């Protein structure tokens, strides 16, 4: 283990001991905000220090076994112990490296998931509906809460555009790698010749701002229009101007919400989505220079990048960023995404580890 890493772990061990002392004091709950901050830090450091203690125990076991090598009657036993201790240290060091990776500050946030139909007309809109169902089934498996924010249905079913809010522990950390272009290859229901068509949708995963005030929005920069909500085919579904369109003039970002009968609620939802879109835009602009110097295949979140192909005739899904192909498309479309997401997270961690190695 590198000296710098060991020094960092020693510091964390000392800090955990300090936290144990602070949390054992009688007046610890006098300041609830401070108490929550301390318990959160304790929960983060505990597993790291525990792993480090196991690594130190393995190192101690190796040292003890080294001392037995001079005894011929104990040599075989000592060599086995040394081998076992080194394997354990190597495994624990890898785990510790992952645990020490820089945390994405957005990882524990709720998200807005936006799906837009792209090339392919009605078939693309139908696929947008299939993608939405896939993500909703995955959210259901995680026991996350889902709220429809905005939808623009197509005439034959599916969506031209749909935005949902997904709330739950680690929502952004699990779904942030879904941003990008999703391509589908299949025979559409309307196809009489049995030909395979290719269509595409774009997915954007945006972390929710804790408060709208977290993103600076000058009311003077907003244009707010109201209009009658309409369903598929353009028919008006109520007689009041309850639908709201909010335009952020400096960025040109436009958000429409018409799902609720209350104009006030639609405006509130639109402002929340707008705040998330502005925050997302700022985040990508901030990381543009970094992406230019070190191309990250996984975490770029580039909307124009084709990240995945869903081939229905072959029953396969291919993620082009990590060259992973899974031949169980039906289960994946039903929200069984754990294997795919875990592979993306692991690859992203490997990229981060490699970049830290380059920095050393």
Swiss-Prot record:
Cytoplasm among keywords: yes
Residue positions where N5-methylglutamine is found in the record: 235
Keywords assigned by UniProt, alphabetized: Cytoplasm, Methylation, Protein biosynthesis
Disulfide bonds: none
PTM annotation, UniProt: Methylated by PrmC. Methylation increases the termination efficiency of RF1.
Signal peptide span: none
Alphabetized Pfam families for the sequence: PCRF, RF-1
Subcellular location: Cytoplasm
Cellular-component GO terms for this entry: cytoplasm
Source organism, top-level taxon: Bacteria
Sequence intervals crossing the membrane: none
Keyword match Cytoplasm: yes
Principal localisation: cytoplasm
InterPro entries reported in the protein's UniProt record: PCRF, Pep_chain_release_fac_I, Pep_chain_release_fac_I_sf, Prokaryotic/Mito_RF, RF-1
GO molecular function term, any single one: translation release factor activity, codon specific
Entry coiled-coil feature ranges: none
Role according to the record: Peptide chain release factor 1 directs the termination of translation in response to the peptide chain termination codons UAG and UAA.
Family listed: Belongs to the prokaryotic/mitochondrial release factor family.
The name this protein goes by in its record: Peptide chain release factor 1
Native species: Burkholderia lata (strain ATCC 17760 / DSM 23089 / LMG 22485 / NCIMB 9086 / R18194 / 383)
């Amino acid at each position: 283990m590198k000296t710098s890493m060991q020094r960092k772990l020693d510091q964390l061990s000392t800090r955990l001991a300090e936290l144990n002392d602070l949390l054992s004091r009688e007046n610890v709950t006098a300041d609830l905000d401070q108490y929550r901050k301390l318990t959160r830090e304790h929960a983060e450091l505990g597993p790291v220090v525990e792993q480090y203690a196991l690594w130190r125990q393995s190192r101690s076991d190796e040292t003890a076994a080294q001392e037995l090598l001079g005894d011929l009657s104990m040599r075989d036993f000592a060599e086995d112990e040394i081998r076992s201790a080194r394997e354990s240290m190597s495994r624990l060091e890898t785990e510790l490296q992952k645990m020490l990776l820089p945390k994405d500050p957005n990882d524990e946030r709720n998200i807005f998931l936006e799906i837009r139909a792209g090339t392919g007309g009605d078939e693309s809109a139908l696929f947008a509906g299939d993608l939405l169902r896939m993500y909703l089934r995955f959210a259901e498996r995680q026991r996350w809460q889902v709220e429809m924010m905005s939808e623009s249905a197509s005439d034959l079913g599916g969506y031209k555009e749909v935005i949902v809010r997904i709330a739950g522990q680690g929502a952004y950390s699990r779904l942030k790698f879904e941003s990008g272009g999703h391509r589908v290859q299949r025979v559409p229901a309307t196809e009489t010749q049995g030909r395979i068509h290719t269509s595409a949708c774009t997915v954007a995963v945006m972390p929710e701002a804790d408060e709208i005030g977290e993103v600076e929005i000058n009311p003077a920069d907003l244009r707010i229009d109201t209009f009658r909500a309409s369903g598929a085919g353009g028919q008006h579904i109520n007689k009041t101007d309850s639908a709201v369109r909010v335009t952020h003039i400096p960025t040109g970002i436009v958000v429409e919400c018409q799902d609720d009968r209350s104009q006030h609620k639609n405006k509130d939802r639109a402002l929340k989505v707008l705040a998330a879109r502005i925050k997302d835009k700022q985040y990508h602009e901030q990381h543009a220079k970094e992406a230019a110097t070190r191309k990250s295949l996984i975490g770029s979140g580039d909307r124009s990048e084709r990240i995945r192909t869903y081939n229905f005739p072959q029953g396969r899904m291919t993620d082009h960023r990590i060259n992973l192909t899974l031949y169980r498309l039906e289960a994946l479309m039903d929200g069984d995404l754990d294997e795919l997401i875990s592979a993306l997270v692991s690859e992203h961690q490997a990229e981060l580890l490699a970049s830290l190695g380059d920095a050393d």
